[in-house]
Amino acid sequence: MKRLRVFVVSDSVGETGDQVAKAVISQFRPGLENTVIRRFPHIQSEELIRKIVFLAAQQQAFIVYTLVRQEMRKLLRDLCEQEKIHAVDIIGPALQSMATFMEENPLETPGIVHMLDDDYFKKIEAIEFAVKYDDGRDPRGLLQADIVLVGVSRTSKTPLSQYLAHKKYKVANVPLVPEVEPPEELLQLDPKKCFGLIISPEKLNSIRKERLMSLGLNDDAIYAQHNRILEEIQHFEKIVGKIGCRVIDVTNKAVEETANTIIEHILTCK
């Protein structure tokens, strides 16, 4: 098998070119066997491009490049043609097509997609918030949250909190159990930002039985019994009635679908 050398040349970190190179090579060598991929990141000078092309010619390497500046792409392309080196421009054609479509010139700023902006930090902050105030751990977070989820056990409160956090919403959730009084903060918050998650007793019974079996426990425990589930749902309805919040039926709904319903409601109420 022929030894394959691939140079990934980028004016940023080179992640895009690296992933494209691996995706293409895997169509010929699924395990990337006998293949060497070398990344050349932050290449923003003519001198470095000339050195890379010289090295590629010596090692008979294939070049994949993602350079946003037109003059740098042209230089690399011309040098590769002179040295008869096979090279593929990953980003240039897309930039040119988009410029024509938008009737605008690109910024040609390397690494702009990786810049850490306000949105990035807001997302990280929201994710940390969701972890800190998950499962009613600290009721002080309820009044700070953008969204509060309440519901009985196994109604997808935690995965929904995490999904919404990735949309930059600070989410806290509280499990409602008949034996435990809900935190007083729950009755103090704006009901428009609180959502009760309800599920059919039959579906909840099935989910809880599966959960018990996955833990190696008997599926006839009180936790999964029909009467217990009805008691919890009745308690849930009593609490959400006091809060005056919207109730969403999550029976057979994907987390994404429920999240979209919540986001639409939040945006409508602004």
Swiss-Prot record:
Cross-referenced InterPro entries: Kinase-pyrophosphorylase (IPR005177), PPDK_reg (IPR026565)
Catalytic activity, reaction form: N(tele)-phospho-L-histidyl/L-threonyl-[pyruvate, phosphate dikinase] + ADP = N(tele)-phospho-L-histidyl/O-phospho-L-threonyl-[pyruvate, phosphate dikinase] + AMP + H(+); N(tele)-phospho-L-histidyl/O-phospho-L-threonyl-[pyruvate, phosphate dikinase] + phosphate + H(+) = N(tele)-phospho-L-histidyl/L-threonyl-[pyruvate, phosphate dikinase] + diphosphate
GO molecular function, one term: ADP binding
Origin superkingdom: Bacteria
EC numbers: 2.7.11.32, 2.7.4.27
Keyword list, A-Z: Kinase, Nucleotide-binding, Serine/threonine-protein kinase, Transferase
Enzyme class: transferase
Residues that hold ADP according to the record: 151-158
Annotated Pfam families: Kinase-PPPase (PF03618)
Assigned protein family: Belongs to the pyruvate, phosphate/water dikinase regulatory protein family. PDRP subfamily.
Biological role stated in the UniProt entry: Bifunctional serine/threonine kinase and phosphorylase involved in the regulation of the pyruvate, phosphate dikinase (PPDK) by catalyzing its phosphorylation/dephosphorylation.
Stored PANTHER family: PYRUVATE, PHOSPHATE DIKINASE REGULATORY PROTEIN 1, CHLOROPLASTIC
Protein name as it appears in the record: Putative pyruvate, phosphate dikinase regulatory protein
